[in-house]
């Protein structure tokens, strides 16, 4: 972990990890969640990873900044200590190598050819990826409560927080359609499948959108929205063989059964909203 700050919502914290191998950082995020939850319990508190516990304030996302490297070697960083309080692997990071997403033209913003193809792959599969990155019923409160920078549109651009993907700096981009309840192993696997599909099949991502998506839509652009419910996202995933292949053998079946059951149990429940809206309603 290299940085943390108080985010917009009351009691909300943002934490950032050093760039590293996708599997290693998935391990770190999972370990942090467990430690955070345990420390909170010891202080009689709840470490809440729920995506949208309150409407009208920022939700909890988990944006993933990505680049694709060749080469590089693992290096142990003891941080100036003679001995370490955990396994060496915890303090090991990839160092060196070549970032294949770096610009390769005079346009210092535009990702290189490999990066553009990778973006194309993500754009193609964004609907199905949403089922992994926004994997709970509550996740979609984040997308419906507009005005808090949650991505609703399947597009990409530079520093454009209304898109599902933005180029956040030369040589890397930020996948935004992912929240605090996601599984980082499945998310990483899904994104790598998108990269592979985009690069192998030369998928063109189209032109980056410089306007906010709301402005673009008002100007007449035909925009594509992300799935706006868990049910819609699961349908998109069921149709996408590339993303399903990120969950091999029985894994996709288990994921589908578990998440479809969650969606159907929600549909079968009477909520407080139902009572507030219809209890004293005269048809």
Describe the residue ranges of each PLM region.
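Active-site capping/gating regions of soluble enzymes
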Residues: 23-210, 215-223
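Short coil/turn segments at secondary-structure boundaries
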Residues: 4-7, 134-138, 248-252
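Short secondary-structure capping/turn micro-motifs that flank functional sites
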Residues: 10-11, 56-57, 254
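Acidic, glycine-enriched catalytic cores built around paired aspartates
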Residues: 211-283
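A broad detector of the eukaryotic-type serine/threonine protein kinase catalytic domain
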Residues: 18-22, 170, 242
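Active-site acidic/histidine clusters and adjacent loop/turn architecture
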Residues: 1-30
